[in-house]
Amino acid sequence: MELTAVLLLLGLCSAGTVLGSEHETRLVAKLFKDYSSVVRPVGDHREIVQVTVGLQLIQLINVDEVNQIVTTNVRLKQQWVDYNLKWNPDDYGGVKKIHIPSEKIWRPDVVLYNNADGDFAIVKFTKVLLDYTGHITWTPPAIFKSYCEIIVTHFPFDEQNCSMKLGTWTYDGSVVAINPESDQPDLSNFMESGEWVIKEARGWKHWVFYSCCPNTPYLDITYHFVMQRLPLYFIVNVIIPCLLFSFLTSLVFYLPTDSGEKMTLSISVLLSLTVFLLVIVELIPSTSSAVPLIGKYMLFTMVFVIASIIITVIVINTHHRSPSTHIMPEWVRKVFIDTIPNIMFFSTMKRPSRDKQEKRIFTEDIDISDISGKPGPPPMGFHSPLIKHPEVKSAIEGVKYIAETMKSDQESNNASEEWKYVAMVMDHILLGVFMLVCLIGTLAVFAGRLIELHQQG
């Protein structure tokens, strides 16, 4: 008994399905019996077909800064009334809506005017939804590649204003009028991008009159998108490494010159920076229209490192100067030895006195004492017969030569130590100056744009 009931129920369902399919089959056959897809769906040729266009943005696929192309995944919703596709639902088993292939009916040839690809028209022919009043809804998916003027001046803290201009290709406003469904695109199903965020999106309808036909309006709907780049990726992978290279360059001046590793560290930093720039160059928009902020900062970092190498060479040269090759000017001694160390609270290096020593070693009277400390004979005059003795006189000349040589060596050592001290003072000054320049340079490049974005909210 139960089996019989189940079979009866299945039979009724199958009969309903067959009847429903039969009604739709009769309806489609009746609608398209004398239908032409090339004729505008109006009762009078003077009537205007009203087409409502809505744009649903699904995904921002790519922004090509070099070729200035924005690739988006969209759904283009189009609605209009076809005068020839109406019916009475009571005559067809209550069927009020049917789905039919879009290529079987008349369609407005809406295209993307600022298309940057080969296909201007929508080539994905999906089915349309048709109801008994003749109202048609067609929402084909499309991949739009639209031209957009990319301004990279503030990259990576930039905003781009891109647009999509939609309109009919062959129909003017006197036969087909397109109207926006809303004053902004539908973003309800938009999938967030990891690089861009849409701050604002608006749509406007335009009447355009061309010189060929000044009395005929051509209508288009233009959607504008204000997109702001998310800069975190570039901050972490480009800006922070460049900043660290700059600080590492400053530390060259903290390294003692005597260690002999100043130039090694400087060249190593330069080589590392060069390799780093070669790796990240593909991340920077390769356009000559403007120099982006990040390009300016990379250029600043390169100049900063090269300047440190040049100045390091000067400091090392100063450190190894000697009185035989360079005589220290008085202004250098006054500035770098007497003035700056006191201002900057350096511990002043102990230097030998520069007072002139008495060159005359012997006095008129020479007091000769016994080596053991016992009192010797009375003092003898310089012209004493003992002094005039050839052997004694030769010994005195030898002592005098040794004393003058020691004095000359001492003066030479003092002069060399003064040059080393000047180099040390220069290192301390340059350490502070380069740290300050690194900070000020970074702020000068990015602070203005960051403040502007903060004010915009």
From Swiss-Prot:
The chain crosses the membrane at residues 231-255, 263-281, 297-316, 429-447. PROSITE patterns: NEUROTR_ION_CHANNEL. One of its GO terms (biological process) is regulation of membrane potential. Disulfide bonds join C148-C162, C212-C213. One of its GO terms (cellular component) is synapse. Keywords: Cell membrane, Disulfide bond, Glycoprotein, Ion channel, Ion transport, Ligand-gated ion channel, Membrane, Postsynaptic cell membrane, Receptor, Signal, Synapse, Transmembrane, Transmembrane helix, Transport. Belongs to the ligand-gated ion channel (TC 1.A.9) family. Acetylcholine receptor (TC 1.A.9.1) subfamily. Alpha-1/CHRNA1 sub-subfamily. This is Acetylcholine receptor subunit alpha. It comes from Rattus norvegicus.
